[in-house]
């Protein structure tokens, strides 16, 4: 382990790490904010030669729960915070600034657990209350259980292609198309043995395109093998019948003709 001292205490509770090309580490902590650290030494004996801490609300513990780091490039970094939304690193001011001051209708939307971005520059914010497709402070869409999602909590987001993403939840995986705003869910009934996933436990193999999602009882791998998606037609059941406003029992009809 490499100790990181910040004043009189160790920097701990690290939840996410991002490494830049010039041996610089960004660390997101659940409770202690964000640290930028420079690594020196050798591969067998790495040392931290410089570390700078970034906090919000004067370092108050409950305000500095940072769960995830998303890098648009080497200098444009976003940090997901539990309770206070998304922050961006400002290289000019050398500080964190909020991406949005929007007051969502549900405060759990500010619990940011995962971040992604599509080809149209829409951000995807995985929250405790669903997925936010964010264009600007005044333009965003929310997708959650009310829209048919398996579960509201989005633990991780991985990009499969330019506008196709996989999301992990507490009840399975969701394949989401940001271009068409359509999705398909995969849970226990679809053969998944792991359905309850963990915060940030996701990885994309850039060489093979394979996606990995970690859950409480194992790992799910999604391989980009070029197979075409199979069409699925769910069973259709009629439980009500209304003819000119009058209710009938569908079971009473041996045949039902619908003219469109």
Predicted features along the sequence, with ranges:
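Residue-level "micro-hotspots" composed of small/polar
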Residues: 5-13, 44-47, 58-64, 104-112, ...
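Residue-level detector of Asp-centered blade-edge/turn motifs that repeat once per structural unit
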Residues: 19-22, 71-74, 117-120, 159-162, ...
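Loop/turn residues immediately N-terminal
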Residues: 30-34, 82-86, 128-132, 170-174, ...
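Conserved beta-propeller blade signature
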Residues: 24-27, 76-79, 122-125, 164-167, ...
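Solenoidal tandem-repeat scaffolds enriched in leucines and small polar residues
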Residues: 11-17, 25-30, 61-67
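Short loop/turn segments that connect beta-strands within beta-propeller blades
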Residues: 38-43, 90-94, 135-139, 177-181, ...
